[in-house]
């Protein structure tokens, strides 16, 4: 797929990795629909993006775990841009909680929330977006769509307090190949990015000393990843037609003990 011909949906696109990805696509000529929950920054984000990329962007209030919410938003995208041929799933939550602690056992509802948003929400977006992609006329290479999910190095090297998060991201990574096989008959590719330590809003709030300590754990380059690097890999995955069913670690070779 050529980026300038893409109508992409980016979940979690109002901040962090998702926002960087949305901007990367917009700057390269794509039409982008950002699906995210409304927050205090949404109004200013909409104004800024419309100022920079008038007519090329939609920002929709969407809960990825709610099928009705997703279906309604997909209809808006189709009416505005006429097609959906790329989905990048960045929506997610990261909640750290040990299995047992001074307060007792890990709350089950908290575990279920992480699984619901990160894993079930990802699959919900995939299944409903794929139905729309199947309606597309194949391009010259026969392709109808491209889906990129977001896992994490925690899928492979989970740390203390990450039982729920690692399970959710491990599920995303494990589903990559079967999803690619399921959708191959529809000429839709599926890949996953597993980012390491990235300078997202979650880490930006840490003291500089803490960020430096985290960066030292990276093999090379010894720094936190930039969201633009995630965005560029997503862009590459869209254009690389032979890349399918793969989970790519984007982590500076970090392997956490």
Label every PLM stretch briefly.
Residues 131, 180-182:
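Alpha-helical segment proximal to the catalytic Tyr-Lys
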Residues 226-250, 255:
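C-terminal substrate-recognition "lid" of short-chain dehydrogenase/reductases
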Residues 2-33:
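Canonical Rossmann dinucleotide-binding motif of NAD(H)/NADP(H)-dependent dehydrogenases/reductases
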Residues 152:
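Residue(s) in the substrate-gating loop at a strand-loop-helix junction
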Residues 93, 104-124, 147-148, 165, ...:
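Catalytic Tyr-X3-Lys loop
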Residues 71, 94-112, 131, 135-141, ...:
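Conserved mid-core segment of classical short-chain dehydrogenase/reductases
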Residues 184, 189, 243-246:
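Short, small/polar-rich loop/turn modules that mediate ligand/substrate recognition or access, typified
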Residues 116, 209-229:
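Catalytic Tyr-x(3-8)-Lys segment
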């Amino acid at each position: 797929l050529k980026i300038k011909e893409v109508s992409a949906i980016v979940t979690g696109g109002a901040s962090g990795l998702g926002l960087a990805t949305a901007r990367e696509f917009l700057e390269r000529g794509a039409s982008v629909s950002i699906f995210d929950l409304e927050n205090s920054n949404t109004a200013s984000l909409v104004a800024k993006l419309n100022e920079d990329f008038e007519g090329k962007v939609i920002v929709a209030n969407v809960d990825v775990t709610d099928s009705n919410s997703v279906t309604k938003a997909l209809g808006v995208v189709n009416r505005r841009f006429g097609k959906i041929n790329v989905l990048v799933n960045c929506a997610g939550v990261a909640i750290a909680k040990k299995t047992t602690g001074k307060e007792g056992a890990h709350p089950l509802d908290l575990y279920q929330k992480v699984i619901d948003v990160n894993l079930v929400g990802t699959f919900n977006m995939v299944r409903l977006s794929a139905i729309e992609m199947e309606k597309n006329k194949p391009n010259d290479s026969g392709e109808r769509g491209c889906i990129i999910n977001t896992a994490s190095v925690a899928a492979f090297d989970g740390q203390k307090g990450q039982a729920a998060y690692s399970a959710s991201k491990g599920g995303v990574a494990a589903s990559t190949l079967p999803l690619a096989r399921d959708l191959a008959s529809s000429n839709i590719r599926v890949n996953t990015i597993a980012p390491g330590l990235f300078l997202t809003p979650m880490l930006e709030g840490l003291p500089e000393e803490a960020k430096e300590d985290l960066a030292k754990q990276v093999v090379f380059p010894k720094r936190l990843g930039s969201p633009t690097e995630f965005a560029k890999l997503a862009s590459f995955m869209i254009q690389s037609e032979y890349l399918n069913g793969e989970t790519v670690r984007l982590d500076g070779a970090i392997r956490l003990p």
